[in-house]
Amino acid sequence: MGKITFFEDRGFQGRCYECSSDCPNLQTYFSRCNSVRVDSGCWMLYERPNYQGHQYFLRRGDYPDYQQWMGFSDSIRSCRLIPQHSGTYRMRIYERDDFRGQMSEITDDCLSLQDRFHLSEIHSLNVMEGCWVLYEMPSYRGRQYLLRPGEYRRYLDWGAANAKVGSFRRVMDFY
């Protein structure tokens, strides 16, 4: 079970809302979000309702302003609690759509896709075990995308506008 608290103002000030499960529309609870406290669990925050728009991965900790979670603005409109996973993590990445081209099987975090695999794009992937977060840039920076177990035949399937991937990591309650 997870627990996250959203605050309208920076520094954990202003009106707040506590949440312990997925919420497709947070607009009724607050108009803006400038700070967040994650008491337990790992969460994905979304800038628009129904889990749309920019995504932000947060784990246990305090985030006194939206820049701490690499936010582009104070707009958080939905959130999803990421299920805990205690087993192994496995994902296959492909250089082309529909699981074609060079394939690599992944079981751990990758700080730089370019350095490790000599790739800058992933066009399709298959998450076999665990949840992962893809980052647009190396060193876990840039736009973020939550990947749950399943097949992603093209980058549009995970919500990206292009195939550019710089890094990725397993969703774990500790780093």
Curated annotation (Swiss-Prot):
InterPro entries: Beta/Gamma-Crystallin (IPR050252), Beta/gamma_crystallin (IPR001064), G_crystallin-like (IPR011024)
Gene Ontology MF terms in the entry: structural constituent of eye lens
The keyword tRNA processing belongs to this UniProt entry's keyword annotation: no
GO biological process, one term: lens development in camera-type eye
Domain Beta/gamma crystallin 'Greek key': 2-40, 41-83, 89-129, 130-172
Transmembrane segments: none
GO cellular component: cytoplasm; nucleus
SMART domains: XTALbg (SM00247)
Signal peptide segment: none
Pfam families membership: Crystall
Function as written in the Swiss-Prot or TrEMBL entry: Crystallins are the dominant structural components of the vertebrate eye lens.
Comment field (misc): There are six different gamma crystallins identified in rat lens.
Protein family per UniProt: Belongs to the beta/gamma-crystallin family.
Identification of the protein by name: Gamma-crystallin B
Gene assigned in the entry: Crygb
